[in-house]
Amino acid sequence: MACLGSLHPLGSLLLLFLLLLLSPEARGEYGLVRVVSKNWSKDYCVLYSSDYVNLPRDLHHAPLLSLHDGTKTPWCPDEDSFHQAQDSSPRQRPLHQTTTMVTRGNCSFYAKGWLAQDQGAQGLLIVSRARNQQCSDTISKPQDPSKPWPALTIPVAVLRYTDMLDIVSHTYGDTDVRVAMFAPLEPVTDYNMAIIFILAVGTVAAGGYWAGLMEANKLQRRQAQRGGGLGGHNQQQTVAAERSQRAWEDDDFEDAPMDFTPAMTGAVVTMSCSIMILLYFFYDCFVYVMIGIFSLGASTGLYSCLAPILCHLPLWRYQWVLPGQRVSVTWPLLLLAGLCAMVTVLWVIHRNEDHWAWLLQDTLGVAYCLFVLRRVRLPTFKNCTLFLLALLAFDVFFVFITPLFTKTGESIMVEVASGPADSSSHERLPMVLKVPRLSFSALTLCNQPFSILGFGDIVVPGFLVAYCHRFDMQVQSRQVYYMACTVAYAVGLLVTFVAMILMQMGQPALLYLVSSTLLTSLAVATCRQEFTLFWTGQGRAKIPAEPVAQPCIASAVGSKMKLEDAKDSRTTNRFEQAVDGESGDLESSTGDDMAEMVTLSEDEATSPEGHSESSEGWSDTNLDPNELPSGSPMALEAMLIPLIQPIPHPSELGHIRTQSRVHDSSLPWMGLHKRKGLKVKKSMSAQAPL
């Protein structure tokens, strides 16, 4: 499946594809051997090959035979001795009705088993110092096809060297030691699969929901900035709004997710293939690099998840200003960073502890997945489809195609996930959720007690879930896409578990997860007739503007603007009366030709030069907000504010000119462009001479 681990979001994706759902496949089959003495008994794990003889499934059906210790003598016959049968009857052979325990030598398992069978033994335990010992890779083939070797009729199993020492220490001096070999049925399912299911679905749901909240917060900030441009009736409010806007911009810069482009998808898949091949050929060296990358990413992810919670506590106020510097250090965040680093170091030290270290690994893994889902964003459904299908092809290739090119016939993905059999480090990739088996089985004694799920099976579909929730926030669809995609992920994971149970082998989980999430998202978008918006990610075009940001149209003007219009009418009437009384030469109506319009836009309000290039050439015609460009997220509707036209020519007004100028300057909207640094553009009718 997939693999993950890095500090930066892009680096984390480069390792996303190395983790698998595939549980390590056993070389041979696992069984148990029950060792019984007068006052002591214990079960040990063995690895046997069903190519010879299958072991009984129940202990009651397994013969309890005497144990013969042959570890101090060599046990490798010559090839010619295979065809020399014993003349004596089975009862007269030295190992009759015994199970022989011998050391691993230079000959094959078959040779040792044939020699024990020829001596009358009913079973053979081969002691091996190697880990992950295979039972089938050491079977020798006869050099002469015309003389086939005789078939084995006794079970041959591999016992670990440490277990042999434990048996000898407990049975020292005891002459009556008996053993029974059996292979109990493994449970088809285990309760730990339910825990893995909850962890995976919960992480995907939480990560997608968090990403959607960030999108909603960003949209609210933009709407607040859009409405804040007209609220400048006093200088204090203006300064406060500017400071708040700068703080918002800083937060957006720190929390802004990284958009993932199709070019990045190709680069990630190419580099992931390279990393997979490096792990396949240089596993013992490169696995430590992966552990280091996971440690850095996990500590960062844990910090990013806990920091927002810490910011709501009273301890947030404690800060320390560095002497001679303008930088302040927040003590709670500094302590939190140290705590996250300590947790990661604790896991690194005890990562191979099977009893409790998996709790730390799962905690760090969930935090890391949430961090990546927050910080990496697929901006369109087109990018999501390309990304998920590329990883699906990557997964299928390394699971089903690579066995055609490997010497052992196993896929590179399985070798990397379970670790090479000849690995000297015995390390495992940490980019997995692992939960121990909760039911007793042979795997519990055989150091195979965990079920695993790769981070890639969580994060890769999680990107689509996060995109769906962001789109919900943009089109205000009551989280329809988010809920549908999350349920589809849960169903796909259940199908993966069922397929693994039915086929008795690991499954490429992305084959089911990608199919279920993509098809469900497409179906929802098609039913809602939003496929084009969903495909291009243009959901923000449907967000209604705030009332304070609407154009100056009679039907959309707020109560505050209506009061200002009423005040304008009263002021105009007073001007008309003054003109009629003093000069009698002016008309009593200012009319449409007396109107002056100030065109404002968000670009002009936020641009350092005070105007935008797109504002050149605009006229005083009525603008429909639906016809304005929506390509740039910062482009807002133009706002038109009616102002009072300076009244007639100076030669005709006399001292009324002075009175009107003084009166106009006292109006709250006059001089707005001077205080705000905005460009004022007069209409053609306002510039025409009287």
UniProtKB/Swiss-Prot annotation:
Keywords: Endoplasmic reticulum, Glycoprotein, Hydrolase, Membrane, Protease, Signal, Transmembrane, Transmembrane helix
Basic and acidic residues: compositionally biased ranges: 564-573
GO biological process, one term: protein stabilization
GO MF term list: aspartic endopeptidase activity, intramembrane cleaving; aspartic-type endopeptidase activity; molecular adaptor activity; protein homodimerization activity
Variant or mutagenesis effect after changing residue 106 to A: Loss of glycosylation
Active site: 395, 457
Spans within the Lumenal topological domain: 29-192, 284, 350-354, 406-448, 504
Superkingdom of origin: Eukaryota
Disordered: region residues: 564-633
A cellular-component GO term for this protein: endoplasmic reticulum membrane
Changes after translation: Glycosylated.
Localisation: Endoplasmic reticulum membrane
Glycan attachment sites: 106
Membrane topology qualifier: Multi-pass membrane protein
EC numbers on record: 3.4.23.-
Subunit structure: Interacts (via active sites) with FREY; the interaction stabilizes FREY1 protein and inhibits SPPL2C proteolytic activity.
Name recorded for this polypeptide: Signal peptide peptidase-like 2C
Species the sequence originates in: Mus musculus (Mouse)
